[in-house]
Amino acid sequence: VSGRLILARHGQTFANVERRLDTALPGAELTDLGVAQAKTLGTKLVERAPSLIVSSYAIRARQTAQHAEDPIGLHADAREGLHEVQVGELENRSDEESHKLFMKVYESWHAGDLRSRVPGGESAVDVLDRFVPVLDALRGDYLEQGSGDIVVVSHGAAIRLVAARLGKVPGGFAIGNHLANTDTVELVPVAGGGWECVRWAKFEAPFHDTARAGSDDPMG
C-alpha cells in the first residue's frame, strides 16, 4: 500500500469570519479568501497526483473541492458521513460561552470520554461511527488497489478527532494544534487495517503530547 489519505480542511467561510458554530448542512459558503485558499490547495496537490477527491456535502467543503480539482484535472465527488461535528443547540452561536462549552466537550473526547456531547449535539462515538467507515471504504477501493493518494475535504474538528483516534496521535497534541483553513493531515495505511498519522499541518511525526497555544477558531 503506497497511497496516502490526505484530509483537508475547507477554505475560509463567512461563518469562520463571524466565529459562528456552523455545523448543520448545508452551511456557509466560502469567502473570496476561502476560494483563493482552495485554489492554492489544488495547486499544492498537483505534485501529489491524487487519484480521487471527495468532500462532505457541506457547501464549504464542496466548493473547496471544486476549486481544488481544477489544477489537478479531477472531478470531486461528495460522500455522506464526512460532515462536521454537529453542535446541536449551539448551532450558529458565536458567544464565548458557547465556544467554551463546545471546547470543553471536544477536549474531553481527546481525553477518552467519547460519549460526552453538547446539548442536542453528537458524541465522539457518533462522529467516528459515521466518518470512519467512509475512510475504510476509500482505503479498500483505492489505496489498497495502488491508486495513489486520495484527498478528503472535510472539517477541522472532525478531522482532528478522526485522525487522532485512527493515527494514535496524543490528545494533547490534537487539542493544541488546530487546523487552519485548507491545512491537511496525512494518514498512511498500515498492516492489519490500522493507520499511521505521518503529517499534521506543518508538523511531521512523531507528535508529542504537549498542548500549544490554541486557536480562536472553535471548529479549526
Model-derived regions, located:
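Beta-strand elements within well-structured catalytic alpha/beta cores of enzymes
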Residues: 4-8, 146-154, 158
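Active-site signature of alpha/beta-hydrolase-fold catalytic machinery across serine-
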Residues: 67, 161-165
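Generic structural signal for well-ordered alpha-helical scaffold segments
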Residues: 39-46, 128, 132-143
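Acidic, low-complexity terminal tails and accessory targeting/binding regions
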Residues: 1-3, 85-97, 140, 144-148, ...
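Phosphate-handling substructures
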Residues: 15, 29, 71-132, 198-201, ...
